């Protein structure tokens, strides 16, 4: 049985066959956003000995110098700012052996029109630096997300689809940088008839990356650690409807597995796929798990005290500095490890459920237990000394 069918945490065999002699590579991956929450999972899974389509050679691209928590992955790390067309061309066009592109990065701007411009330009820069120069290019994976059906974060009162979300739902008649990215992908990829594509739309992602702009698990770990340090109850900062309502999440390893499946399986070509754990949960249940993982006895939802993390974490910078020193954590500022605005968005809504039927019908049967997934990523933030 393929590891993407196993559905367990760590389904991909986390083992490199170090004793094998050097070998030629069947596939060559280029991960754009390798230090991000899914990029980090791709960098761990692609080089494994049993990964489909392999053996894989892996290039990993990120804007910043390589962090210590990413350093063990056997990849060729390239520091490159893909928002800079010249930097992108000079560093990526020499990679003539690339066969597969995994585009899993994004940037955030103040308005959606600026998001469309910035994110569209980044994707175009990458594709124009690779497509004309990589004669063996076979496939491009583009990661977007559930906002395809909801619109941008600012679309509070605007049009949105009713869940469960399915891939055949039409685009909303609003600006959305995901739509811009799709259009650019289609425009650039049609220049080479032999290159195929897939689009992946994960829900809220459970994964590991201190650099991620949408890092819900890491952010909640930091909040819980501060509550534990101060002896405060772990109060749910979001809305009652989010506390009580059904939600779904996407394990970062599962997303990586789906992208690899789509990259190598002929039945998955030129299609868009939702990606979630194929189960549902309530925050009221995960909150108990979060409290247990940090040894907090008093926790829950209290009406009137759900002020949001942006408000609740004001003035906690000195507290975090003390915690970093006391626990010998990685020296990161509070604003680097706690994405409060994003957590407030996520913990203020409910019912963002998308269907996995299409993905299963096409042959991807991977899944995760969201409770176990949540715990496994909490453990990783502790192991890498992001939180105590």
Curated annotation (Swiss-Prot):
The modification N-acetylserine is found at residue 2. Expressed in roots, stems, leaves, flowers, seeds and siliques. Expressed in the vascular bundles. InterPro entries: NAD(P)-bd_dom_sf (IPR036291), PRISE-like_Rossmann-fold (IPR055222). Induction: Up-regulated by wounding. Not induced by drought, high salt, low temperature or herbicide treatment. GO terms for cellular component: cytosol. NADP(+) binds at residues 35-37, 63-64, 81-82, 105, 143, 178, 205, 212-214. GO terms for molecular function: Delta4-3-oxosteroid 5beta-reductase activity; enone reductase activity; protein dimerization activity. This is 3-oxo-Delta(4,5)-steroid 5-beta-reductase. It comes from Arabidopsis thaliana.
């Amino acid at each position: 049985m393929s590891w993407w069918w196993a559905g367990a945490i760590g389904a991909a065999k986390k083992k490199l066959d170090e004793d094998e002699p050097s070998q030629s590579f069947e596939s060559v991956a280029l991960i754009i956003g390798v230090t991000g929450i899914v990029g980090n999972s791709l960098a761990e899974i692609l080089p494994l000995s049993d990964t489909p389509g392999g053996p894989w050679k892996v290039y990993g691209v990120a804007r910043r110098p390589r962090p210590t928590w990413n350093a063990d992955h056997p990849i060729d790390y390239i520091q490159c700012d893909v928002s800079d067309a010249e930097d992108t061309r000079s560093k990526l066009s020499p990679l003539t052996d690339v066969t597969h592109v995994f585009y899993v990065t994004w940037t955030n701007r103040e308005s959606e029109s600026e998001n469309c411009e910035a994110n569209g330009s980044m994707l175009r820069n990458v594709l124009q630096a690779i497509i004309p120069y990589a004669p063996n290019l076979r496939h491009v994976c583009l990661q977007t997300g559930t906002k395809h059906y909801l619109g941008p974060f600012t679309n509070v009162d605007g049009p949105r689809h009713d869940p469960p979300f399915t891939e055949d739902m039409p685009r909303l008649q609003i600006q959305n940088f995901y739509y811009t990215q799709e259009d650019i992908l289609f425009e650039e990829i049609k220049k080479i008839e032999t290159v195929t594509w897939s689009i992946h739309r994960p829900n809220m992602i459970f994964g590991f990356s201190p650099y991620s702009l949408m890092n819900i698990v890491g952010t909640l770990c930091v909040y819980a650690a501060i509550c534990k340090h101060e002896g405060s109850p772990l109060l749910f900062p979001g809305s009652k409807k989010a506390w009580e309502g059904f939600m779904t999440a996407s394990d970062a390893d599962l997303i990586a597995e789906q992208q690899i499946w789509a990259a190598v399986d002929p039945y998955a070509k030129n299609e868009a796929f939702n990606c979630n754990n194929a189960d549902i949960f309530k925050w009221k249940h995960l909150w108990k798990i979060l409290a247990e993982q940090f040894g907090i006895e008093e926790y829950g939802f209290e009406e009137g005290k759900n002020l949001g993390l942006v408000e609740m974490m004001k003035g906690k910078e000195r507290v975090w500095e003390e915690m970093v020193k006391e626990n010998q954590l990685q020296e990161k500022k509070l604003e680097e490890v706690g994405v409060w605005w994003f957590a407030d968005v996520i913990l203020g809504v409910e019912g963002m459920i998308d269907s996995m039927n299409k993905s299963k019908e096409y042959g991807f049967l991977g899944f995760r237990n969201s409770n176990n997934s949540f715990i496994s990523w909490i453990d990783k933030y502790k192991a890498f000394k992001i939180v105590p």
